[in-house]
């Protein structure tokens, strides 16, 4: 009977898919024992308590879980935006540091988590942008300026000189929706200085 249940569970698993324990509960009457056996034999890999990956083989070995699927299962929501602080380098403001932590804006969790070998810092926010535009990236840069390795004054000087290259209305809307109070204040100051 146990072998029949294990076979049914194996047939249910899809390579590259991420599962929560609750996704598999209907397949077994003794789920924890069967999950342990599937992990021990390599059919599943435990990522976090209650979170599992069905490994997918590639020509380079085991492929990591697709980030979007992983975060969606972990958060139990698709309202999130993941980015790397390395993306700030694309703004042309003089940021050059490389970071090995991904940032996830979401409405559920806050803190540092290790998932599938990757470090993620989850920021809980009331509003989460749907996509990472240049203007949203500027707002995120200002929101997290104290955490960056670069000198804040140098970044602010670069930003004030580059401000005309951004869509002003979209930047102010993004700041209003996703920015902290100090980010909104700083952008208003820049805006009034440029228009004066």
Which residue stretches match the model-derived regions?
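Short beta-edge/loop segments at beta->alpha junctions of small alpha/beta modules
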Residues: 1-75
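Short coil/loop linkers at secondary-structure junctions
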Residues: 30-31, 94, 181
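Amphipathic alpha-helical interface surfaces
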Residues: 31, 83-84, 134
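Hydrophobic alpha-helix position signal
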Residues: 38, 87-88, 175
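Residues at alpha-helix termini
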Residues: 41, 91-94, 145, 178
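Short gly/ser-rich loop at a beta-strand->alpha-helix junction or flexible surface loop bordering the NTP-binding
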Residues: 46-56, 71-116
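A short, charged helix-loop
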Residues: 116-124
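Hydrophobic alpha-helical interaction segments
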Residues: 125-196
């Amino acid at each position: 009977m146990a072998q029949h249940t294990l076979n049914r569970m194996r047939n249910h698993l899809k390579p590259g898919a991420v599962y929560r324990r609750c996704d598999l509960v209907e397949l077994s009457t003794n789920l924890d024992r069967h999950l342990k056996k599937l992990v021990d034999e390599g059919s599943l890999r435990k990522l976090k308590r209650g979170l599992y990956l069905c490994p997918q083989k590639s020509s380079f070995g085991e492929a990591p879980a697709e980030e979007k699927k992983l975060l969606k299962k972990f958060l139990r929501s698709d309202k999130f935006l993941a980015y790397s602080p390395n993306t700030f380098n694309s703004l042309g403001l003089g940021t050059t540091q490389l970071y090995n932590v991904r940032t996830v804006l979401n409405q559920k969790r806050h803190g540092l988590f290790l998932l599938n070998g990757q470090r993620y810092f989850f920021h809980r926010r009331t509003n989460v942008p749907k996509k990472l535009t240049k203007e949203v990236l500027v707002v995120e840069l200002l929101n997290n300026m104290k955490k960056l390795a670069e000198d804040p004054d140098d970044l602010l000087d670069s930003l004030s000189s580059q401000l005309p290259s951004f869509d002003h209305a979209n930047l102010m809307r993004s700041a209003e929706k996703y920015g902290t109070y100090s980010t909104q204040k700083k952008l208003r100051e820049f805006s009034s200085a440029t228009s004066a």
